[in-house]
Amino acid sequence: MTLIILILGLGYLYLAKLASNLDFVSTNKEDFDIDPTVEKTLEDYRCVAILGSDARKGQGYDGSRTDAIIVAVIQKSTGNIQLVSVMRDSYLKIEDANKSEKLDKITHAHAFGGGVNTCKSLNRSMDLNISEFVIFNWKAVSDLVNEMGGIEVNIKSNEINDLNRYGPETAQNVGGKYKPVNKTGKQIIDGPQAATYCRIRKSSGGDPGRGSRMKIVMSALMKKAKETKISTLNDVAERVFPEIRTNITKTGILKTIAQIPSYEFGKNRAWPKDYYGGLLNGVWYAVPRTLESQIRWLYKTTFDKKGYEPTSRAKSISNEIINRTGVQ
């Protein structure tokens, strides 16, 4: 979500000052275990993990899971930005708290090792080159939307029940009051409503629906930001930056600002495209069908790399998933 703030167009020097208010995590590129072949293949792409934590009000990010996982793919040569949402229940290879690798839900990676572990797991399982992450909780989303004066979204009929069912709980967690949504269609929603809109999934599209709504909110914030005065955006950043954790350095933030004029949003996608959703030993997972083929699809559609051959590491993980689940 910090990427939204970065692209808002805040004053260069003022933003440098505000950046010191971020919850900064120092990392090294070697921490992210990027395959050398992948690094070369994706040299024209900057991938940033945007992670929505399920940490409740008053809780820190450490030990929390990720309710939302979005990879922002920025093509350096064109400025095109694509958002790829990864299903939180995707059955992938992660590291546990003891640094042992195992197959599990990708959402658990953050609980075991924070943003670095999530990015490293995505890199290993999906042949990505992520070395930057932004972590936010639903309070940050709520505060951001409120500071922007609300956003316009199109509420569908199957979303209303979940919104009003989980809205009061979300409002309590983010420190606000929930106003029931009483109609479908385009309408302005406030912070607690937007945070709930991003979280719901039970009867409103499941995990893919949640990822889609998160991308809708990000796009709506972008649209609203383009219509907002700089002075208001400064107030937004002052309020929200302290709630956001990232390893993007101040230099990296300012470099992003300098590239803003060339940025354009392209097509958004949900990953995996083809998967088995069901119980394995009593636990629901989204099992890529197969991991290898889903990597090829991602490279073809997102990176314009037709005929991409996944790394031996990714193929090994794919075979392990097939052997463990029988899904292929």
Sequence positions of predicted segments:
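Non-catalytic, solvent-exposed segments at the cell envelope interface
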Residues: 1-2, 9-328
